[in-house]
Amino acid sequence: VQMADGRLAETPLRGALWQALEVDSPQALKALVVQPHFGAAGFARLAPLVDQRAQMGDPHAAAVLQRSGEALAGMVHTVAGQLDLAAPAVCAVGGAVLHLGGLRDCFERALMQRCPGARLQRPAGDACAGALHLAAQTPLRC
């Protein structure tokens, strides 16, 4: 959208994104992204394309991944601070962090800067398994 309205310079990334979204003008892009059905999922489906372009050396795509990694690390930093966790183990369960190497690498680098000692780890199970594990550790109250 920033390229469409002139806030950012035109780049090959814009063309790739517009092709993926099947739009051919700034007006079509703006109309698409405000549709109720587009939402966060509409932007999220572009993540693999941005990750791929970044790994091909596109500096604009790399900047998007860097900002995204920093934003994720900032959220971890805030939560860890509120919970007084010095070096938390972080289980990223969203598809983008699990499946997009460029994003995961940016997140991990930013995490090391914002939360020294924190580490990414694969979850041992899903949310239900975690809830059952916590329930098993909690004494029964009658």
Give the role of each language-model region.
Residues 2-142:
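ATP-binding/phosphotransfer module of carbohydrate and carboxylate kinases, centering on a glycine-rich
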